[in-house]
């Protein structure tokens, strides 16, 4: 019974901490997503132009046509 009470109090405490800290970070998820996309795109450059050969791991600027093995 004591263990159950301690677990319930701990869960409620952690939930309260999550709720109080989430108000201060409102609207930053979009910024984080944009930053992560920018970082990924910077890591992948330089990309291959259209007509270049591509494989299973696409390094094309656009998409990879797997059937023709060429960047589109």
Swiss-Prot record:
GO terms for molecular function: ion channel inhibitor activity; toxin activity. Keywords: Disulfide bond, Knottin, Secreted, Signal, Toxin. Residues 1-22 form the signal peptide. The presence of a 'disulfide through disulfide knot' structurally defines this protein as a knottin. The cysteine framework is VI/VII (C-C-CC-C-C). GO terms for cellular component: extracellular region. This is Conotoxin Lt6.3. Disulfide bonds join 47-61, 54-64, 60-71. The keyword Signal applies. The lineage of its organism: Eukaryota, Metazoa, Spiralia, Lophotrochozoa, Mollusca. It comes from Conus litteratus. Expressed by the venom duct.
């Amino acid at each position: 019974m004591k263990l159950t009470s301690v677990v319930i109090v701990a869960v409620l405490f952690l939930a309260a901490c999550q709720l109080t800290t989430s108000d201060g970070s409102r609207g930053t998820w979009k910024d984080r997503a944009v930053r992560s996309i920018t970082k990924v795109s910077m890591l992948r450059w330089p990309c291959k132009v259209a007509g270049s050969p591509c494989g299973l791991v696409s390094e094309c600027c656009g998409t990879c046509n797997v059937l023709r093995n060429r960047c589109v």
